Amino acid sequence: MYIRRSSRTHKGKTYTNYVLVESVLTPKGPRQKNICSLGDLQPRPRAEWLALAHKLTSALSGQAELLASQTPDSELQELVAKVQSARPLSSTEDSARRVAAESDLVAVHVDQVRTEESREAGPVHVGYQFWLRLGLDGILAQAGLSERVRQLTCVMTLNRLIHPASELAMPDWIRSTALADILQIDFRLLAEDALYRNLDKLHTQRVAIETALAERERTLFSLDQTVFLYDVTSTFFEGLALSNPKAKRGYSRDHRPDCKQVLIGLAVNRDGFPLAHEVFAGNRHDSTTLDEMLTALDTRVGLLPGQTVVVDRGMSGEENLKKIVARKLHYLVAEPYGARSDWVRDFENDEDFSEVKRETSPTNPFQRKSTIRVKVRQVGEETHVLCLSSERMAKDRAIREAHEKRLLVDLEKLTKRVAKGKGRGTKPAEVLESIGRLKERYSRVARYYRMEYDSQTKVFSYSLDEAKRVKAEKLDGSYLLKTDRGDLTADEAWRIYTLLTKAEAAFRTLKSPLGERPIFHHKEGRVEAHIFLCVLSYHLLISIEKTLLNAGVHTSWATVRETLKTHQINTIVLPADGGMVLRLRQGTAPEAAHRDLYQKLRITSEIIRPHKTWSTAEEASK
């Protein structure tokens, strides 16, 4: 530091002022920074000005030694007080004072330094930051849930996101992570009963929470609300679930017809964000759930005239289409496979087909996309889109040939059994029952085989209807879309329909990575709360992946989670002189891969602020 003299003249009078100046190094080179105005000081030789500046520097840095000078000590003290009142302490001075006050500058027994209580921190840190970004704590508070319920809902949701476990195992997982450090909550006494009770409290407010969350995500990510994608899946129970009236046996997408199940209906937008979900009885047909879901959507996000509902062929019946139109909405659906028979000639005719231009995946630029060709046919006010897929053609042919091969084997077995005329399954009623089962089991190919049984002669025979098989071969790789929107080209209609994979991807994620199935709860409310908890965790997951996608990063949450598992929190134990032990609780230094992900996700890499604790060696040993 040094003292600079400045003068200015006003109305014929000259005013002199002395300023304490510090030289600082900036990216553009050394610069002078005014620290404080010292006022009008006594005139003195230049050497004494330098000595005074040195004394001020020494006094401000806390040094006791002062240089001898003609300047009175009272003047120095006055100048020090003036400078201190005019500026905050520098980081160096502040650090020096803290060191002096807390005696952190200590001698450490290096051979006794150790780390303890290491906890996985990276994934829970990201999950909690997105919990805050989505404003979930405030949303739960607006729903009337207490602070304790909000805290437990947070950790239960993060468990589903990171390492799904039952409520019985969840407390141990929570204690194995850095959640206690991040949330500043003691989970040492947390038991599963508290988590079960929390599900009961959460269940009553799920509609209000889902409504507020959908609006928050819409504004946060600028989401499109013109297209709704709806699909249904099933999830099965372990046990009989006698106390749940919705637990029924039905068509199982999980290939568990032996278990009771419930149906889950989920509506998402074109970016894959959930808008509404409902839980239905396990024996209901998909088509019977659409009207209830439209009502739920109207409650959660509000339906507006002109929006488009996209559903798969299982819900594309005329009754459902009338319900969609009655709400002044548009529809885009896949027609049942049987409807293709009316369009065989159009599928055979290559004219008017145009190829859909498909971009390669950023994560796999060398992947070969299947060829998709589409064309439009107008029937009244409806637009029919005929689609041909090269990949699906090969798949359909392989499935059909495999089914036909197995059907022929079973037909030969039935023929031999009937010809033998003895034993089980040879009575006329039993033979007819066997024929019915074969037609049901091999419905894809049985329709072009004639199966006949003469109860008088007790002869069973079958024959191939070649015309029907040729017709089926011509439809390999084809499917049919239908919409009441006249403004869509064939290409646009196909692209909107394929967005339905967003709902299918959500179901796959809910069932496996987020641990939605199987369900061990039996009470209806807890089952629905369990499913809602999985949906909440999916909100976090899709928000994380959407943020990365917006940053140009095409990766999954599973990859992010595995990468960040090595970012931890631990306690460094530093035995010091005098029988004292310093414990420093802090996060490990993030690696380059960690910092890159945190930057892309726009969250801090500092998980917690370092926390220091002093204790005696005797206390530390306990």
Regions found by a protein language model. Give the residues of each.
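Conserved, well-folded catalytic cores of nucleic-acid-processing
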Residues: 44, 59-63, 86, 173, ...
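Acidic, glycine-enriched active-site microenvironments
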Residues: 25-27, 45, 51-52, 59, ...
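Compositionally biased amphipathic helical and low-complexity segments enriched in hydrophobic
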Residues: 39, 57, 61, 67-68, ...
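Short, surface-exposed polybasic/aromatic micro-patch for ligand or macromolecular engagement
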Residues: 4-59
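Anion-binding and metal-coordination hotspots
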Residues: 2-5, 15-17, 27, 91-97, ...
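Short, flexible loop/hinge motifs at secondary-structure junctions
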Residues: 71-98
